[in-house]
Curated annotation (Swiss-Prot):
Residues 239-248 have a biased composition (Low complexity). InterPro entries: TAF1B/Rrn7, TF_Rrn7_Zf. Residues 252-261 have a biased composition (Polar residues). Residues 233-261 are annotated as: Disordered. Residues 100-111 are annotated as: B-linker. The keyword Cell membrane does not apply. This is TATA box-binding protein-associated factor RNA polymerase I subunit B. GO terms for biological process: nucleolar large rRNA transcription by RNA polymerase I; RNA polymerase I preinitiation complex assembly. Residues 349-496 are annotated as: C-terminal cyclin fold. Residues 112-348 are annotated as: N-terminal cyclin fold. Keywords: DNA-binding, Metal-binding, Nucleus, Transcription, Transcription regulation, Zinc, Zinc-finger. It comes from Caenorhabditis elegans. Although it shares weak sequence similarity with GTF2B/TFIIB, displays a similar subdomain organization as GTF2B/TFIIB, with a N-terminal zinc finger, a connecting region (composed of B-reader and B-linker regions), followed by 2 cyclin folds.
């Protein structure tokens, strides 16, 4: 029953009432509405009393009929639309729920608990949805769906936030988590309690009067109300005390039958105090647990590997997420992010540099994502449950995707037999999570050092913010190693650096035609207009334009002056396909841009579209030509034939028996330019370790940039295109792919040096390493140091740290950007308080040690490969 506008329940604030036996009750709480009197119907209408006034509603059919007849017949169209909109708005307002009736579930929940529950629920929902799509739409086996959730449960148990019996604190009151909340329903509960007592008194009084033997005496005394109220108050107090004791203490049975934990929920006026069975440490760990798309990639990839899929790479899972195959919405990504503004207000975080806050949409190169996946795999120790990856099967899949002859696969396998490769996603030869922090230790860290702890998870030295991007780790993924083998195979087989590159015979493989096909298929995959791509007279511009300062640099205004800042992680990466995450399936508004469709949904679910996206473009373009043949009438016929040409059955050379016959260009093989020195690639285990070690050698961003920048001037156009295109396919930065190529190249061209380094490391013999010690930009001193492994090892896989043969202080890498005096000196902005003597002393303190490239990179090649 709808009430009048000013009728409102005094107990709960509801607006709906029901009439029963002459009384009006609230539909929401059942409270009695006292100011109500039911009247009789008169004159076809109904009268209701609200407060002290009367509202009379009459039905007059004659007047209504006359009013309708008097309305104009031909109304303007605008007026008709206006009246229709008014009626529709009135109807929607009547159907809408009033604000007083709407109870939000998080109104009575603390913000941190509500945010924590949202993160766990949203991430679990994404995992369940991804598993369902993999099984029911992409035709993976059903056990994948179970392995995904089981892997996530194992991750939560490792971080001690699975909320199981082992994480409960028992009966120790000091370790329990106590939630102190505001009782938002205090006034409502107080009104309901008064109304309940009032109704209980009336009921008890009537029962006492009907059962009493001296009922006539009570009626004749004149004070019946006083006696009944006193009796009702005494009974009500006893019942309330017993009910309060039962409501406050609730027994919760744990997995251990001999132990029971009391959960105390006490409401004291405006404050509600809930003493839970969980420990405070578990809640703190759960609040800073890593839950982002990088962790989603790690869980999905490990679950697929645990299900027996050996050829699925990390780059495949990343590409599926970017292609919107799992239909992850922006809202879901927003919910799994940590509450950064709240943490900044509490003083836990100084700057917005939290792991999953700076870049939530996977705009990272592959080596950045591999860091998170490696931490996940090594922390949970999943190597025993994951199927081992085979180099042969992954190489065969790569050759098939690129439409290369089968002879290329045999040559790649020959190279792998000469130079064995570790293709395990664990990356134990490169890094060890025990050298830094695992996932459980990161979750237990203090919030203010949580981000730096994640970046130094492999034992790197903490750096300043201005030079940190040069010192971060670059991990070589199995995807990058496969591309390195393919590049070296092509360079040893064909003369990529010369004008003439293939035999003039239709039976043999033409590498130039294949490069042209690869270029067109990549542009088709990127979404270019193929009617323009296959015309020789048309120029097709690139879709992605590099920013002036680089993708990792931000331009902003600070106090009216332009500033450029660098992010610690390599965020903003767009050298991949697709360049951004697509939210087409979950967006509410259609796109306004003319984007070429990448095929039907049924075609996108084919296994070829999942595993061989480059090869799948022939299906996409073939369907596009069938739908609109007129658009492709004026294209170059030779380019069209090259696009659909099959190169898998072609021969590369004649029958081969020796290494020189398999690789005819090995005799005249030329090395690209390499730097003479390498820097910013060593780090002590901790600041408190002696300067002689233990020291870790790693591949840094600056060393990769120096290596690629030095060699780029000697690249041929064919090799430059292949490096860019193959890096684009796996979504990796080309500097990491080229670093892997140089390491593989050193194993083949400098095999004696590599073997000597390997023997010295296994026998703990000092390795002579030339160095240059720089005090300023012009003065340097040559040095020689001996490098040995920290402990005797019997396998290269056990190599972790190094030690220097003698103590010296010059190996400390102190970049010039840390010292503010030197920054001011170089910018010619010396403050008045800084004297020339202080500037000279600062220059003498700045020391930088550069290592000989060939020897140092040879040590990394032995360790990484």
């Amino acid at each position: 029953m709808h009430s009048a506008k000013n009728e409102k329940c005094n107990a709960c604030g509801g607006y709906r009432f029901s009439v029963n036996d002459g009384f009006k009750y609230c539909d929401r709480c059942g409270a009695l509405f006292e100011n109500f009197e039911e009247l009789e119907e008169e004159e076809g209408g109904l009268q209701q009393t609200v407060g002290q006034g009367k509202v009379k509603v009459r039905k007059n059919d004659d007047q209504k009929r006359v009013r309708n007849n008097a309305a104009p017949v031909n109304l303007p169209k605008a007026q008709v639309m206006r009246e229709a909109l008014e009626k529709r708005s009135d109807f929607l307002q009547q159907q809408a729920i009033k604000g007083e009736e709407l109870e939000l579930p998080h109104d009575a929940t603390p913000d941190y608990l509500y945010r924590l529950a949202l993160r766990l629920f949203s991430f679990t929902q994404i995992l369940a949805k991804s598993g369902h799509i993999l099984v029911h739409e992409l035709n993976f086996e059903s056990r994948v769906q179970e392995n995904i959730l089981a892997t996530f449960q194992k991750y939560l148990a490792h971080c001690q936030v699975a909320f199981c019996h082992s994480e409960q604190c028992g009966n120790d009151e000091h370790l329990r988590f106590v939630a102190v909340m505001e009782n938002l329903r205090y006034e409502q509960e107080e009104r309901e309690e008064k109304q309940r007592k009032r109704m209980a008194k009336r009921g008890k009084g009537v029962n006492a009067l009907s059962k009493s033997a001296a009922a006539w005496t009570l009626l004749t005394q004149g004070n019946i109300t006083e006696h009944l109220d006193i009796a009702s108050d005494e009974d009500g107090d006893q019942d309330a005390q017993g009910g309060q004791q039962l409501d406050d203490l609730t027994l919760e049975t744990t997995q251990n039958p001999d132990e029971s934990i009391r959960v105390n929920d006490t409401t004291m006026g405006f404050v509600r105090k809930v003493t839970t069975a969980l420990s405070k440490e578990a809640l703190r760990r759960a609040s800073q647990l890593i839950l982002n798309l990088e962790m989603l990639v790690a869980i999905l990839h490990s679950a697929l590997m645990s299900s027996g899929y050996q050829t699925i790479l990390t780059s495949d899972v990343v590409r599926w997420i970017r292609e919107d195959r799992f239909r992850i919405s922006r809202r879901s990504i927003r919910l799994i992010r940590q509450s950064q503004p709240e943490r900044m207000k509490q003083g836990e975080v100084v700057k917005p540099t939290i792991v999953d806050y700076a870049e939530p949409f996977l705009r990272f190169p592959l080596y950045e994502i591999m860091r998170t996946c490696t931490i996940f795999h090594q922390s949970l120790k999943l190597a025993s449950s994951m199927a081992p990856q085979s180099f042969e099967s992954m190489s065969a899949r790569l050759v098939d995707n690129l439409n290369l002859p089968s002879d290329i696969l045999s040559r790649m396998l020959i190279l792998e037999s000469i130079i064995p490769c570790d293709v395990s996603p664990q990356l134990l030869k490169q890094v060890d999570v025990d050298m830094g922090y695992n996932c459980g230790q990161l979750a237990a860290m203090s919030p203010n050092v949580y981000y730096s702890g994640f970046l130094t998870s492999f034992g790197r030295k903490e750096r300043g913010t201005q030079d940190a991007d040069f010192c971060d780790e670059v991990l070589l993924s199995p995807d990058a190693k496969l591309i390195a083998y393919l590049l070296l195979t092509l360079r040893l087989t064909f003369q990529l650096d010369n004008a003439q590159c293939a035999l003039q015979d239709d039976q043999y493989f033409d590498v130039d035609s294949w490069i042209h096909q690869l270029e067109m298929r990549i542009k088709c995959w990127q979404g270019h207009n193929m009617s323009l791509v296959m015309r020789s007279s048309s120029h097709v511009p690139e879709m992605v334009v590099d920013p002036p300062f680089g993708t990792n640099y931000l331009f902003h205004q600070e106090k009216g002056a332009p500033q450029v800042s660098c992010r610690r992680r390599q965020a903003g990466f767009q050298k991949c396909i697709p360049t951004e995450m697509s939210f087409n399936s979950t967006s509410t508004l259609p796109t306004v841009f003319d984007v070429r469709h990448m095929g039907l949904l049924t075609e996108r679910c084919q296994m070829e579209a999942l595993i061989s996206p480059v090869k799948f473009q022939r299906t996409v373009l073939g369907n596009e030509i069938e739908r609109d043949p007129l658009t492709f009438e004026n294209v170059d016929r030779q380019s069209k034939n090259t696009f659909f040409k099959h190169f898998s059955a072609f021969k590369t050379t004649e029958s081969c028996d020796t290494f020189e016959e398999y690789f005819p260009c090995a005799k005249n093989y030329l090395l690209f330019k390499r730097p003479d020195w390498i820097q910013n690639c060593t780090a002590r285990q901790t600041h408190f370790n002696p300067v002689t070690g233990p020291i870790r050698f790693y591949l840094s961003n600056q060393s990769c940039d120096d290596l690629l920048g030095t060699a780029a001037t000697s690249f041929s156009r064919r090799f430059q295109f292949l490096l860019d295109a193959l890096s684009l396919i796996i979504g990796e930065d080309k500097k990491a792919v080229y670093a892997a190529f140089v390491m593989l190249e050193m194993h083949l061209t400098s095999s004696e040096r590599i073997q000597s380094i390997r023997d010295d490391l296994l026998t703990s013999s000092p390795i002579t390493l030339k160095c240059q010690k720089f005090r300023n930009s012009t003065h340097h001193i040559p040095r020689k140091y001996g490098v040995i492994s920290e402990v005797p090892i019997d396998r290269i896989e056990n190599l972790r740290y190094f030690r220097l043969s003698r103590q010296f202080f010059e190996h400390e890498e102190m970049p010039t950007t840390i010292n503010m005096e030197l920054i001011d000196y170089r910018n010619q902005e010396i403050r008045d308080s800084v004297t020339e003597t202080e500037v000279q002393r600062a220059q003498n303190r700045i020391m930088k040690l550069c290592y000989e490239f060939e020897q140092f990179f040879g040590i990394l090649a032995v360790k990484f490969w």
